[in-house]
């Protein structure tokens, strides 16, 4: 049991560094609600296997080894072979950035993207994740792929990224109902100020939602051309679903 607890604490530390970026041992201890000496021991062990590295200012950060691990994991997703070309065409035709994300335990993980002209303003990248309640990909997956959305909502109020992030159970529940009714999600500055997106579910041959395709850019442009972008994303989704048919 002690070994399991140590591994659980190590995973929590890794998840915290992935979500928040470099942290001091004191910040990590407070965030994870574990003693600071425990953080030091975990960091030393993870550094020994090149998963965490200490920075010159004594903060802890994920090592560059995670980039290789993420790339290996991405290449292992053989069901998405050929998805890159589809995303490239979508990004080229709309000039927005296209993301393919899959559901995981804590949120939507980006496995592929095609960069638009405004990529510098976006938070999501391949290998990164966003929680289920924020962003077009996360919320469409929460509505249509999460095994128990009500249980997720029981954790509200949830972390806020901007003033537009929905953090209360009531507003999120209404949003999920709207997503199910119209078939896609709309993100309007709920992750990054000035950024919007639309997100659509991608289904396998059995009809199960296995991923989300989202298109993101400046909020004003996404809002002004929403119908056009939804139609373009829908066409790309149809192509992606052929890969899994």
Region spans (language model):
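Amphipathic alpha-helical effector-binding/dimerization core
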Residues: 58-156
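Cysteine/selenocysteine-centered motifs that mediate thiol-based redox chemistry or coordinate metal-sulfur cofactors
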Residues: 142, 151-160, 237-245
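Amphipathic alpha-helical regulatory segments at dimerization interfaces
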Residues: 16, 31, 84-93, 99, ...
């Amino acid at each position: 049991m002690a070994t399991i607890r140590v591994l659980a604490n190590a995973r929590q530390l890794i998840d915290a560094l992935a979500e928040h970026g470099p942290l001091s041992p004191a910040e990590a201890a407070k965030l994870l609600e574990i003693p600071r000496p425990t953080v030091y021991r975990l960091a030393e062990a993870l550094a020994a296997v090149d998963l965490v590295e200490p920075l010159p200012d004594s903060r802890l950060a994920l090592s560059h080894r995670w980039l290789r691990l993420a790339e290996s994991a991405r290449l292992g997703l053989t069901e998405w072979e050929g998805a890159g070309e589809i995303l490239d065409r979508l990004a080229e035709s709309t000039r927005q950035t296209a993301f393919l994300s899959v559901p995981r335990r804590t949120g939507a993980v980006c496995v592929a993207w095609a960069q638009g002209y405004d990529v510098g303003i976006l938070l999501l990248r391949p290998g990164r994740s966003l929680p289920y309640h924020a962003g077009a990909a996360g919320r469409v997956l929460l509505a249509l792929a999460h095994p128990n959305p009500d249980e997720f909502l029981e954790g509200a109020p949830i972390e806020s990224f901007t003033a537009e992030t929905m953090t209360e159970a009531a507003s999120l529940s209404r949003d999920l109902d709207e997503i199910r009714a119209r078939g896609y999600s709309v993100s309007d500055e709920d992750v990054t100020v000035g950024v919007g997106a639309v997100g659509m579910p991608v289904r396998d041959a059995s009809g199960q939602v296995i991923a989300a395709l989202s298109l993101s850019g400046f909020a004003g442009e996404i809002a002004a051309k929403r119908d056009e972008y939804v139609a373009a994303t829908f066409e790309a989704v149809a192509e992606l679903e052929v890969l899994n048919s």
